[in-house]
Amino acid sequence: MNEAKTESLTYTLTNNEITNDYKMLGINIDTKLTWEPHINRICNKLSGVLYLLMNLKKVLPDNYLKVAYFGYFHSVIGYGIALWGNSAHTNSVFVLQKRAIRIITGSNIKEHCRPLFIRERILTLTCLYIYDQLLYMWDNQQKYQQRHEIHSHDTRNSNTFSLPKTRLTKSMLNFEYMAIKIANKIPEKMFKLPKPVFKTKITDWLLDKAYYKIDEFFNEERNY
């Protein structure tokens, strides 16, 4: 069967309206899992937050402005990011995050933001995604097999988690696949640490990195 030429037809005996996306637990899920409707909704909300930050900038010192940022902006982009954080549409969210940090720091529109993220100790969107995925893997590490549990002979990086076999790009981008792939880029010993220590070390490391793209993380020779 040629999947590229296959069309689907939905049959129903009810009068319920068929929609291309629906909202569940605050997350907009579309039928093609592009996450575009959810990201568009986030951007609309964040645009309002930027307006709020600009007004607060006039009356609040920077430390209180950062509190407002974490309460109204950071909390929005962090919600459910493990699901949508690797979407092709996330750049529109990151553009707004860079505008937010320029407002907080009083920087001009042409100011490079990476040093600002590092100085202000604010996780970039990509770093927030990586953090969330690593935290998921720490919580669920017993659920996934490590390579030494599958192969009887020694293999390179035998203590890393085994990736599921998949050929479809959409499958390779799903959140579990990406979580394992991200986890395999940091030393296995990190997952032996107590959770509070793990969270602190991962956070400090990501704050110093300020990745803009997930490819920056994967292309580094040694991430941690």
For each predicted feature, which ranges?
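Amphipathic alpha-helical
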Residues: 139-178
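Charged boundary/loop elements
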Residues: 78-90, 94, 173-224
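Conserved, non-catalytic sequence blocks in retroelement Pol enzymes and Pol-derived host proteins
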Residues: 33-42, 56-67, 83-94, 119-125, ...
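Extended, well-ordered alpha-helical segments in internal regulatory regions
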Residues: 72-87, 128-141, 181-183
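Short, charged alpha-helical motifs in flexible N/C-terminal segments and linkers
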Residues: 2, 68, 92-149
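Short, conserved micro-motifs composed of acidic
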Residues: 1-22
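Basic, alpha-helical interaction scaffolds
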Residues: 18-82
